[in-house]
């Protein structure tokens, strides 16, 4: 596992963004772990979070022109990613985000920041049902731009109601790559190697066996 992945897991655990235990997801599914990126909520947290996204971008070598953060959670992520890319790697990319409600005065429209043009890197925390991606694709298509890739913090690598995960459905429907800072396999490797969390291994393995893709 790359060091930035291990560091990100430690960071998420230290902020209680990532927790092991027993949790009920919105779907009603019982999960042995929970991830809530909304708890990255200080300036220091967002600065570090942006650096992890930037590290994943560098590792993937994805080619893109604009960072797009869909409302609402994607807005601070997109901003922190663009700042981290510049501060860490000297890469200066424009950033754009949308508002949920169209504004009919001032600058108007539903996009703020850079024009949505060229190859778009969409950044968000997780993909649960893929709804935010589908809404974003309407904006990207309407602006005659192209979705280069999607980058999220965590890929749970679990199927939804069908055989595919929401991420696999996005990749299939939009012919794009979905990247992540970490995925379920990284989490499994981390707890297998760390005695602090090894007690959660049986539940994690059982969960992956039942719901994994």
Swiss-Prot record:
EC annotation from Swiss-Prot or TrEMBL: 2.4.2.10
The protein's required cofactors: Mg(2+)
Tagged with keyword Metal-binding: no
Key words of the record: Glycosyltransferase, Magnesium, Pyrimidine biosynthesis, Transferase
Binding residues for 5-phospho-alpha-D-ribose 1-diphosphate: 26, 72-73, 99-100, 103, 105, 124-132
Reaction catalysis annotation: orotidine 5'-phosphate + diphosphate = orotate + 5-phospho-alpha-D-ribose 1-diphosphate
Positions annotated to bind orotate: 34-35, 128, 156
Pathway: Pyrimidine metabolism; UMP biosynthesis via de novo pathway; UMP from orotate: step 1/2
GO cellular-component term (any): cytoplasm
GO biological process, one term: pyrimidine ribonucleoside biosynthetic process
CDD domains: PRTases_typeI
GO molecular function: magnesium ion binding; orotate phosphoribosyltransferase activity
UniProt record similarity statement: Belongs to the purine/pyrimidine phosphoribosyltransferase family. PyrE subfamily.
Quaternary data: Homodimer.
Annotated function: Catalyzes the transfer of a ribosyl phosphate group from 5-phosphoribose 1-diphosphate to orotate, leading to the formation of orotidine monophosphate (OMP).
Name of the protein in its database record: Orotate phosphoribosyltransferase
Source organism: Haemophilus influenzae (strain PittGG)
């Amino acid at each position: 596992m790359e060091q930035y992945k291990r560091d990100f897991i430690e960071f998420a655990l230290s902020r209680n963004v990532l927790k092991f235990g027993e949790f009920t997801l919105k779907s009603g599914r019982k999960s042995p772990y929970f991830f809530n990126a909304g708890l990255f909520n200080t300036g220091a947290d967002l600065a570090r979070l942006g650096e992890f996204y930037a590290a994943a971008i560098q590792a993937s070598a994805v080619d893109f022109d604009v960072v797009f953060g869909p409302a609402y959670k994607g807005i601070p992520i997109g901003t922190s990613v663009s700042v981290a890319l510049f501060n860490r790697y000297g890469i200066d990319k424009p950033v754009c985000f949308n508002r949920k409600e169209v504004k009919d005065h001032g600058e108007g429209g539903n996009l703020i920041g850079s024009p949505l043009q060229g190859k778009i890197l969409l950044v968000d925390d997780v993909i649960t049902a893929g709804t935010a991606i589908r809404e974003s694709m309407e904006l990207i298509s309407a602006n005659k731009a192209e979705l280069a890739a999607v980058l999220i913090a965590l890929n749970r690598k679990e199927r939804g109601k069908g055989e595919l995960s929401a991420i696999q459905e996005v990749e299939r429907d939009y012919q794009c790559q979905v990247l992540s800072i970490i995925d379920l396999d990284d989490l499994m490797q981390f707890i297998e190697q760390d005695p602090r969390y090894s007690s959660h291994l049986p539940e994690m393995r059982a969960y992956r066996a039942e719901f994994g893709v």
